[in-house]
Amino acid sequence: TKSIRVISAAAVEKANSGHPGMPMGMAEVGTVLFKNVLKVSNKQPDWINRDRFVLSAGHGSMLLYSLLHFNNFDISIDDIKQFRQLDSKTAGHPEVDTSLGIDITTGPLGQGFATGVGLALAESYLSEVLGKDIIDHYVYGIVSDGDLMEGISFEAAELAGVWKLGKLIYIFDDNNISIDGNVDKVSITNQKNKFESIGWHVLEVDGHNESEIVEAIDLSRKEKSKPSLIIAKSTIGKFAPNKQNTSSVHGAPLGSDEMEL
């Protein structure tokens, strides 16, 4: 997780643009997904029955690129040095390329959330048509406060509850920080109550405790008739000495002084 934090912050610093806070805050969640959970192959990244991963919070793209790099997908350290540069593999927001392990394009808030619901619906349909011996996989994703504020995500979430998409598991990066300050200044929504009211299975965990995250995902996989939302309490910019848990780490480089610390 330290390597993910360092490489994410360094890439944003080199580009002088980007969002280091979310990758640093979701390092444990990302590590658990790629180390313990996702059924994917770096040798056959576009395998039809792979698990899908949706980084709905696409502004935190360096989390995905660092995870793909450390798991031997076709994202090299030189590619990461080209973060946010024209024609690079590592765009500011992820752009779909299944050969690299990037399942969908994300960035506009809420869009990835809704697309993931579509992916889970497709899995459910194709599993019935083709059989579970051919299609039997999960859709996992990381969603942000900003995603959940968007109308498109709530509409899609309600459909997921109606359709009982038990193969859909989202992890909510609940850090209470936006680019403009604390989320609770603009939203008082109880996400647990909201999602439970529309047919979701909801759990709460410490977003920096890997064993809790693993256990929550295991429990969610056992809930066959409901989509799951795992609310991961996290600290944006975790381990940035002076900027963690502040809006300043959301959408700007840490700065040379902070990087040296």
Regions found by a protein language model. Name each.
Residues 42-43, 98, 102-261:
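Glycine-rich ThDP/TPP pyrophosphate-binding loop and its adjacent helix/strand module
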Residues 1-138:
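Thiamine diphosphate
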